Amino acid sequence: MPVERVDTLVIGGGQAGLTMSHRLTQRGIAHLVLERHRIAERWRSERWDGLTFQFPNWSVRLPEFAFPHGDPDGFSAVPAIVKFIEDYAAFVAPPIRCGVAVTRLRRSDDADGFIADIADGGIAARNVVVATGPYQRPLRPDLLRDHPGLFQVHASDYKNPAQLPDGAVLVIGAGASGAQIAEELRRAGRRVFLSVGRHSRLPRRYRGRDLFRWLADIGIDQTPVELRGPTRLLPVISGADGGHTIDFRRFAADGITLLGRITAARDGVIAIAPDLAESIANGDAAYATFLGVVDDFVSAHSLDYPDDPTARAQLPDPPCLTEPLHRLDLSAEGIGAVIWATGYGLDLGWIEIPVLDANGDPRHRRGISEIPGLYFLGLQWLSKMKSSFLSGVGDDAADLADHIAGRLYA
C-alpha cells in the first residue's frame, strides 16, 4: 500500500486537534490532521437533544477565537457549541481530511518515526499527536445482561424522553450527564430512580458569581497535575434552565427516588449498596469545602461580594435517604428503561507502541510521552485541571508545538 509522508500527524479533528493544528501553523510546522468522521463528531452524535453546556458562555473560547454570545453568564445548547467549533475550523483552516480513520499506529521500520495505517495505505510521520479526546468508549457495566426485554441505552446514545418506552426510568450514574438527564425525565412526567455514587458537588453560583469565575480568579483551574489529589471525581454541575446547583435532596423532594450504587442484578431484581448516605455526605463535604475556600479568598483580598447564607441552607433528608432501598424489582416498579450514565474510558488499543499502562492509559508527562515524537492532547488533567476544557487546550497545544519544533529544528 502507498505510504504518504508528513512532518507531523495529528489524529483527531475535534477542538483539541484543531487547536493543535493552529499552534503548529503558527510555528511553520507542516502537518496533516485526520478525523475519522466529521469535525466535532462527538458533539453532534453523542449528546442528547436537551443538553445544555455546563460551562458559562464567557469561558467558552479557543486560541484567538471567542465564542459569540449575548449573555456572558448564560449557557448554550449543543448546536451553538457545534457551530462554534465549525467556525473555529474555518478560522484555523487546517490541512484536514475527514472520514479517514486510523486503524493502527506503529513504529516505522527505521524506528525514527511512526506509521499510521488507514484504509487505503499509510501515513509516515516523524511526530504524532493523538488528540482523540477523553470521552472515547462508553462504559457500561454488564449487570443486566439477563434482562433482554428491558430497554437499555448509554447516555452517549440517549436523545430525549420520547425515545424511551412507557414507564418509569432507572438512571444509573449521577454525574453531570446522569443528573441532567434525570431532571429532564422528571420534567417530562416520568417516574425516575437515580443511582448515586461517589461524587463532588459544587455550587453553580456563590456570592453572586458563577463557579467558573471563582475557579479562574482563585487559580484552582490552573492547579498542576502534580498537585492533583487522589480523588478522580468530576464536579456535578448543570447549565440547564439558566444554570443551577445540583442538590440531590431537592431531586428527592421533586419526586426522584435516590438509590445507592447498583452492585448486582438477577432476574430483573437489582441489589443496591447501603452507601447512599455516605455518598451524599461526601458530596456535601466537597460543597462546603469549596464555599470555605471562596470565603477565605474574599476575606484575604477584601473583595466586595456579599455573604450568601442561602447557599448553606439544606433540605431535610428525604425518606429514600433515611430508609434507603436495598433492592429494586424492575417489573414491580414499572421500570421500562435503564439509562447508563456511567461515564467513558479511553480507547487507544489501536496504538501498537509500548506507551500504554495496564489500564490502557497513556504514559506521558504533560502530554509528552516516553516515546520520542509521540504526544497526547486534550486528556483530562494532561498538565492542569483545565486541560480538557475548551479554554484550556490552547496552552497545552502550544507547549507540545514548542516541543515538536525543538525536535524538527534541532
Annotated model-derived regions:
Residues P2-G13, L18-S45, F75-A410:
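Flavin (primarily FAD) cofactor-binding/catalytic cores of flavoenzymes
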Residues A40-E64, F251:
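Redox-cofactor-proximal catalytic regions of oxidoreductases
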Residues L62-A66, G378-Q380:
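A short small-residue
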Residues P68-P72:
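A short acidic, helix-capping loop that chelates divalent metal ions and anchors anionic groups
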